[in-house]
């Protein structure tokens, strides 16, 4: 991805080292289908990462953390704590990703990989994906799709930044993941939108 406003020199190895510091070990050979329980933590810890720039491949995709992460949205008008959630009634390509009250369920957990992928815990082998048909324009759908190690499935959440960026539609840091501000409760659409520094574009990622 073109990095015109921040350094492009963050390597996959650096990202691994940073993320591992949160939990002590990285699980290089873990199989998402073999996981049967979400490990509990005593206190949530924030997680930040820089994905490899577009066109820079990682040596071997692997998970950065042993346990899945939880992604919360800090929309100022939210009625309660809200999480990034995949529709549990779906699971196929194109399944909706939405905002929902945090409830500790598997559809609100994601495995972070060193290529920037966020794999659904509920639907192993499906990754958070920006719809190519939207072209990165305002309203581009965020969905799940077969994990395929492509830039539209590579995300970053740099330290000191509230936003989550997509590698395919980075736009010099001007396009970010956004929740529909017109829906304050469950079911708000998750999409790409021009960065506007408003709270619907503020996210926290937690290892807990």
Over which residues does each language-model region extend?
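Residue-level signal for beta-strand positions within conserved beta-sheet cores that form or flank
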Residues: 93-95, 137-140, 151, 186-188, ...
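Secretory targeting and sorting signals
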Residues: 1-32
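Aromatic-rich beta-strand patches that line glycan-recognition/binding surfaces
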Residues: 95-101, 140-146, 188-194
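Short coil/turn segments at the loop-to-beta-strand junctions that recur within blades
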Residues: 103-106, 148-151, 195-199
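Short, exposed beta-strand-loop hairpins at the edges of beta-sheets
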Residues: 180-182, 191-197
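Intrinsically disordered, low-complexity repeat segments enriched in small/polar residues
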Residues: 8, 14-17, 36-39, 98, ...
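Extracellular glycan-recognition/adhesion modules and their associated mucin-like linkers
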Residues: 2, 29-91, 106-136, 154-184, ...
């Amino acid at each position: 991805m073109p990095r015109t406003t921040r350094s492009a020199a963050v390597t996959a190895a650096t990202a691994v080292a940073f993320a591992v510091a949160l939990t002590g070990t990285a699980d290089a050979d873990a199989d998402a289908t073999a996981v049967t329980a979400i490990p509990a933590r005593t206190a949530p810890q924030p997680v930040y990462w820089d994905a490899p720039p577009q066109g820079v491949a990682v040596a071997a995709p692997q998970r950065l953390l042993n346990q899945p992460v939880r992604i919360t949205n800090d929309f100022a008008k939210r009625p309660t704590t809200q999480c990034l959630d995949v529709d549990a009634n779906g699971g196929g390509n194109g399944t909706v990703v939405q905002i929902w009250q945090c409830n500790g369920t598997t559809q609100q957990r994601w495995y972070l990989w060193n290529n920037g992928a966020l794999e659904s815990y509920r639907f192993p082998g499906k990754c958070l994906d920006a719809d190519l048909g939207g072209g990165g324009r305002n309203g581009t759908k965020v969905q799940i799709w077969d994990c395929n190690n492509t830039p539209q499935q590579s995300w970053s959440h740099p330290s000191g930044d509230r936003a989550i960026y997509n590698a395919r539609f980075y736009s010099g840091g001007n396009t970010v993941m956004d929740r529909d501000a017109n829906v304050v409760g469950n079911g708000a659409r998750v999409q790409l939108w021009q960065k506007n520094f408003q709270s619907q574009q503020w996210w926290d990622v937690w290892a807990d």
